[in-house]
Amino acid sequence: MKPLRLSLLAVAMAAVLVACGSTSGSTVDSADADATVTSVDMAFEAETITVAAGEAFTVALVNQDSMPHNIAIYADSSKSETLFEGEMVTDGTIVYDIEALDAGEYFFDCSLHPEMTGTLIVEG
């Protein structure tokens, strides 16, 4: 019975360590990003972000909610053409590397919460 008890204890401890150490995204410094979007109370604080055309760019998502969020970029609000979909982050910050886009106006949202929306303006 002792080996079984030790095995169960080891499994339980491993589960606790995994649960405590798990994150849905990298905790990073958003200061170096080209644009920053903060999610608070199920809304994006920056409803419009602007970047330069023809250059790859970075967007930091600072998630201050306890729910997972991400940023997905679409050609327009119909969401028929997805240009980028970032991984989810819960209660932390993640910086997305996004390929260059042509000058224009694009739509972004959180994939899980479509009411969280914004406009990406690419100038050039």
Regions found by a protein language model. Name each.
Residues 66-89:
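Histidine- and aromatic-enriched segments that form or immediately flank copper-ligand environments
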Residues 5, 20-30:
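Bacterial lipoprotein signal-peptidase II cleavage site
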Residues 41, 62-65, 73-77, 100-102, ...:
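A mature extracytoplasmic/lumenal domain signature
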Residues 47-67, 94-109:
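Beta-strand cores of secreted/periplasmic/IMS beta-sandwich domains, seen most often
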Residues 22, 89-124:
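Extracellular/periplasmic metallocenter environments
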Residues 1-8:
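Bacterial N-terminal signal peptides that target proteins for export
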